[in-house]
Amino acid sequence: MKYLPLFHNLRGSRVLVVGGGEIALRKSRLLADAGALLRVVAPEIEAQLRELVAASGGECLLRGYAEADLDGCGLIIAATDDEALNAHVSADAHRRCVPVNVVDAPALCSVIFPAIVDRSPLIIAVSSGGDAPVLARLIRAKIETWIPSTYGHLAGLAARFRDQVKGLFPDVQQRRGFWEDVFQGPIADRQLAGQGAEAERLLQAKIDGEAMVTTGEVYLVGAGPGDPDLLTFRALRLMQQADVVLYDRLVAPAILELCRRDAERVYVGKRRADHAVPQDQINQQLVDLAKAGKRVVRLKGGDPFIFGRGGEEIEELAAHGIPFQVVPGITAASGCAAYAGIPLTHRDYAQSVRFVTGHLKDGSTDLPWSDLVAPAQTLVFYMGLVGLPIICEQLIKHGRAAETPAALIQQGTTVNQRVFTGTLADLPRLVAEHEVHAPTLVIVGEVVQLREKLAWFEGAQGQI
């Protein structure tokens, strides 16, 4: 081990920073966040650095460095572009046995700064010992995606109850077992879900010896339009801790593969007028699985609250007192339009956008047509393929120009994406001619003409 990792309490301690430029500013921000009192020495000091020092109760010395500047300082930072000066500062600090860091010069350092993941009070440090700082930063970036920001709140919860638990369990092994149970169970789940008051109530009940009810939880997760890279960090984390996954037809196989390997997978997909599993049965499955203590991911394509019937499902959960979380996803309109190079709004073409379902609960296409032909408006139709001839006919009948630019986006955001553009009157012909099938999004509006300039993503199937 080249360096021993330690965490230094700098709160209220004087730290000397030699240098007044951008590098000194970056180091000083980190030190100020840790509560250090800054003493910055340089002939010239950037305005932002001066403001930072003033806000932290430190001092700026507009002159060259002198060894006496080390007096009373518990840490020294040399952050200038003068190698000789940096070496001089390092030698002075070593002679006084004061920890010193020289930026980009590991050989002159007695301490080095790691790459930091801050989930205060939880802190994770990654270091390559100065040999590969870029690699350390890349690893930190990966850890940032694995550890949610709410883990800091979880550590804070433990801190508030630490003394109670220590009094209850004098034995170290007992305390460790208690906290392991807390951090891997429903108490942690409540805190990570942002339900701090409920987490505190459950933890106090556990300390008081009350029996824990083993109700599971349901995570209603939006899987986005198809590209796995469009999943949120939160969605991925919950998918990887679920015991059971109930998934729809529109969830891409590549996304399903990101779920926990040993999770039970249950297909509950639906097509128009062909529901593999009726909605009320899906609702009951969610309730039953949660009551059995399972952590259940209900995985839906796009966003669960935009034509996804997510509201119906969590109404049922709420009626049975089942804990749930909702994780929004990128809806098909946003994702598919972006990957097709079609901005849904544009100052010159559309000041509003309207998301419309292509068929209603009873299977009809009875829509408020007079509202849908307003000028400077983009229309996006979900599930509109079957009713497309009626949609085009009614829009034209109610005043939308037959030559209005329009697009069909099949399997948007995936390698199988196909995009067909034409006019509103052309759409039914394009569907028949190119054998377009679901899932396909329909966009109507002047913004479609921008695709010719803005298209950037080309799926394996090409576009017309």
From Swiss-Prot:
| InterPro entries assigned | 4pyrrol_Mease, 4pyrrol_Methylase_sf, 4pyrrole_Mease_sub1, 4pyrrole_Mease_sub2, CobA/CysG_C, NAD(P)-bd_dom_sf, Siro_Cobalamin_biosynth, Sirohaem_synt_dimer_dom_sf
In the UniProt entry, which residues are flagged as the active site?
A: 248 (proton acceptor), 270 (proton donor)
Q: Which positions are annotated as binding NAD(+)?
A: 22-23, 43-44
Mark the residues carrying the PTM Phosphoserine.
128
What pathway annotation does it carry? Answer: Cofactor biosynthesis; adenosylcobalamin biosynthesis; precorrin-2 from uroporphyrinogen III: step 1/1; Cofactor biosynthesis; adenosylcobalamin biosynthesis; sirohydrochlorin from precorrin-2: step 1/1; Porphyrin-containing compound metabolism; siroheme biosynthesis; precorrin-2 from uroporphyrinogen III: step 1/1; Porphyrin-containing compound metabolism; siroheme biosynthesis; siroheme from sirohydrochlorin: step 1/1
Say yes or no: keyword Ribonucleoprotein present. no
Q: Catalysed reaction(s)?
A: uroporphyrinogen III + 2 S-adenosyl-L-methionine = precorrin-2 + 2 S-adenosyl-L-homocysteine + H(+); precorrin-2 + NAD(+) = sirohydrochlorin + NADH + 2 H(+); siroheme + 2 H(+) = sirohydrochlorin + Fe(2+)
Residues engaged in binding S-adenosyl-L-methionine? 225, 301-303, 306, 331-332, 383, 412
Region of interest (Precorrin-2 dehydrogenase /sirohydrochlorin ferrochelatase), ranges: 1-203
- Which GO molecular function terms does the record list? NAD binding; precorrin-2 dehydrogenase activity; sirohydrochlorin ferrochelatase activity; uroporphyrin-III C-methyltransferase activity
Q: What EC numbers are recorded for this enzyme?
A: 2.1.1.107, 1.3.1.76, 4.99.1.4
Q: Which GO terms describe its biological process?
A: cobalamin biosynthetic process; methylation; siroheme biosynthetic process
Q: Does the keyword NAD apply?
A: yes
Q: Where is this region: Uroporphyrinogen-III C-methyltransferase?
A: 216-464
The record's Gene3D superfamilies line, in alphabetical order, gives: Cobalt-precorrin-4 Transmethylase, Domain 1 (3.40.1010.10), Methyltransferase, Cobalt-precorrin-4 Transmethylase, Domain 2 (3.30.950.10), NAD(P)-binding Rossmann-like Domain (3.40.50.720), Sirohaem synthase, dimerisation domain (1.10.8.210), Siroheme synthase, domain 2 (3.30.160.110)
Family from the record: In the N-terminal section; belongs to the precorrin-2 dehydrogenase / sirohydrochlorin ferrochelatase family.
Please give the name of this protein: Siroheme synthase
Q: Which organism is this entry from?
A: Pseudomonas fluorescens (strain Pf0-1)
